[in-house]
């Protein structure tokens, strides 16, 4: 698990590039995190009350500084998602290894934040197939969980295609003690996307 905090790999396919988030991403990412149509799909569980709505570039830069600080502290890794055709950041992915005494101990937690126009089954499926396979080894986990609210119909379809299944278990908030629902889970042994999309690690 320590390797990813020493050198963060990038991943890409024909459409998207996932690479370590940078402060300069703020200019593009503010359009993601100020997108009120995207906001309901962000996972802010156990995040000190932050709802990830950043209405200006100043606030966006503050958030990215926190992401970079968290990476240095080995709390989580944040990748920026680049649309290769537009040369534009259209979202981020956060992943970390969760160690706690609840139903989701020693799992990888994956958070996907996207600009609302990319909240489609096809786009999500393409992005998830870049990050899910390497996550098991990078974060030393046998299972990965991600939150998918019941109204996120496009995301639900994409997660099913990747191989995730809805869990009935609740996630205990280590910060607030609240029990969070709507988590989907995938096991390393059953990862088998229904479509054959090839992702390659960028050297």
Feature map (PLM): residue ranges:
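A short helix-loop-beta-strand connector motif used in the catalytic cores of GNAT acetyltransferases and
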Residues: 52, 59-80
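Short, well-ordered alpha-helical scaffold segments within catalytic/effector domains
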Residues: 57, 61-64, 125-129
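A short gly/proline-enriched turn/hairpin at secondary-structure junctions
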Residues: 39-54
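Short, intrinsically disordered/low-complexity patches at protein termini
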Residues: 52-55, 63-65, 169, 178-180
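A general structural-boundary detector
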Residues: 16-17, 47-50, 68, 146
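Charge-dense, low-complexity intrinsically disordered segments
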Residues: 50-58, 118, 122
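Acyl-donor (CoA/ACP) binding surface of acyl/acetyltransferases
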Residues: 1-42, 78-203
